[in-house]
């Protein structure tokens, strides 16, 4: 069967029914389908999961009764600890992740070694890089609008903040800059690993500065480079003296710091931008999975990790003061895949999966979790036998109301993260003001009573 990038998909694709008296699964509502999978999940440890939908409703109702009856909550013992908000946030009052807006196809994405192959520009265009080609899909027209290609296989991609350029990190140490309108290469440069260390590398991570006047790259040999907007070299530093599979980099919102780490390592570096001088570092006994800057603070870095006993942890690192606060997230046996702060609400979005549940089902049964603090989950989706596979990367739409996730099952799912903005209504209507103005002119300012 021929598959096209950004082709329409459904969660429950199946062959046509031969028996016309048996209703297809798609005819049932999503809520009913999610309630019907109890047979394989009656195992006691899984049903006792505190993130299980039934237990979440009980917890929410308990809090409601405590507030209505003016009872003291058991959590009040830790009230002093929780008075300090770990990260700035305006949490939602309703849940919105119960439905997906669109489900599109990403052929061959499951074979990609590096996951950062998806981005969303400020002019509402999604890009997916697969192999040497990249494909652009317009949110407004809901269709594929253009395609482009790179000289080598693409490992990562990123739109500039202005939406004019597309940055591509590729194999053979090359970074390319493409014009977003024409989908053609206009500039390129290479990493200095070959000249300095006589090694060929791959560009595995890229990120733009907040102004779009410069960008950073990270390679598979642990080198970090800063470039101008025209791909001119600014600085180059080598921090890891061994081959690493995936390096992660992220520029702070105030454009002063560059966070650098490698997946499945324990060290996070903080460099000055754009000189790439060492500023600070943290070393722990965790396994680093992802990093993300909070968009509402000048330099508050979130570090997502997993401990040896499979406990997900989040460390919040305030770069100017070098203070680090870490806390556990959720129950044990949950592993962290991706993490992102919402620029609209400040909420923390996590993609996690339960290793125990993954043993029972062919899919890892990922959960998208939206948290306002380490102890409060305000929204979630993803329980069931046929649901969300592991999310490898995710990006927000420009207005922050949609969340696009790319899964190991080669699905691009666009979620309704928040309700769309209502159109501004005119507070003054010309139809009602025209008659009084005409009468005032006709009567030359006199008022007849």
From Swiss-Prot:
Asked if Ligase is a keyword of the record, the answer is: no
Q: Which GO terms describe its biological process?
A: anaphase-promoting complex-dependent catabolic process; positive regulation of anaphase-promoting complex-dependent catabolic process
Keywords attached to this entry? Cytoplasm, Repeat, WD repeat
Q: What does UniProt give as GO cellular component?
A: anaphase-promoting complex; cytoplasm
* One Gene Ontology term of the molecular function aspect: anaphase-promoting complex binding
Gene3D superfamilies, per the entry: YVTN repeat-like/Quinoprotein amine dehydrogenase (2.130.10.10)
Sorted alphabetically, which InterPro entries does this protein's record hold? Cdc20/Fizzy, WD40/YVTN_repeat-like_dom_sf, WD40_repeat_dom_sf, WD40_rpt
The places in or outside the cell where this protein is found are: Cytoplasm
- The WD repeat boundaries are 108-148, 149-188, 198-237, 283-327, 345-382, 386-425
Q: Where is this motif: D-box?
A: 386-397
Kindly indicate whether the keyword Repeat belongs to this entry: yes
Which cysteines does the record link by disulfide bonds? none
Q: Write out the function statement from the record.
A: Controls wing pigmentation patterning by regulating scale cell development, thereby playing a key role in mimicry and crypsis. Probably acts as an activator of the anaphase promoting complex/cyclosome (APC/C) that promotes the ubiquitin ligase activity and substrate specificity of the APC/C.
Listed name of the protein:
Protein cortex
Q: Which gene encodes it?
A: cort
């Amino acid at each position: 069967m021929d598959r096209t990038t950004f082709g329409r998909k459904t969660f429950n694709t199946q062959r046509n029914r031969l028996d016309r008296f048996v209703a297809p699964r798609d005819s049932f509502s999503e809520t009913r389908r999610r309630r019907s999978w109890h047979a394989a999940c009656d195992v006691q440890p899984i049903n006792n999961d505190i993130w299980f939908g039934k237990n979440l409703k009980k917890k929410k109702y308990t809090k409601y009764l405590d507030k209505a009856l003016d009872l003291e909550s058991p959590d009040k013992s830790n009230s002093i600890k929780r008075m300090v908000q770990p990260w700035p946030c305006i949490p939602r009052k309703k849940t919105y992740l119960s439905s997906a807006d669109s489900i599109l196809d990403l052929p061959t994405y499951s074979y990609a070694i590096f996951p950062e192959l998806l981005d969303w520009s400020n002019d509402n265009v999604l890009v997916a890089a697969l192999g040497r080609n990249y494909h652009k899909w317009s949110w407004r027209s809901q269709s594929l609008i253009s395609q482009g290609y790179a000289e080598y296989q693409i490992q990562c991609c990123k739109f500039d903040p202005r939406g004019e350029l597309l940055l591509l990190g590729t194999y053979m140490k090359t970074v390319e800059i493409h014009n977003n309108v024409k989908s053609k290469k206009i500039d390129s440069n290479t990493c200095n690993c070959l000249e300095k260390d006589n090694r060929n590398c791959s560009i595995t991570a890229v990120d733009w500065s907040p102004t779009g006047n410069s960008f950073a790259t990270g390679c598979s040999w642990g080198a970090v480079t800063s470039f101008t907007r025209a791909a001119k070299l600014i600085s180059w530093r080598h921090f890891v003296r061994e081959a690493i599979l995936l390096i992660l980099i992220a520029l702070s919102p105030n454009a002063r710091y560059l966070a650098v780490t490698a997946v499945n390592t324990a060290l996070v570096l903080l460099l000055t931008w754009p000189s790439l001088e060492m500023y600070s570092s943290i070393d722990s006994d965790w396994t680093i999975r992802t990093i993300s800057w909070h968009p509402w603070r000048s330099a508050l870095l979130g570090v997502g990790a997993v401990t040896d006993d499979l406990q997900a942890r989040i460390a919040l690192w305030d770069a100017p003061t070098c203070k680090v606060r870490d806390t556990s997230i959720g129950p044990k046996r949950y592993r962290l895949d991706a993490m992102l702060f919402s620029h609209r609400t400040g909420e923390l979005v996590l993609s996690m999966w339960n290793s125990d549940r993954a043993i029972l089902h062919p899919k890892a049964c990922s959960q998208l979790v939206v948290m306002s603090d380490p102890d409060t989950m305000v929204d979630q989706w993803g329980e069931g036998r046929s649901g969300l596979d592991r999310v490898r990367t995710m990006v927000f739409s420009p207005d922050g109301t949609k969340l696009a996730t790319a899964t190991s099952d080669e699905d691009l799912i666009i979620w309704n993260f928040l309700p769309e903005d209502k159109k501004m209504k005119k507070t003054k209507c010309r139809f009602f003001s025209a008659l009084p103005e005409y009468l005032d002119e006709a009567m030359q300012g006199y008022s007849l009573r």
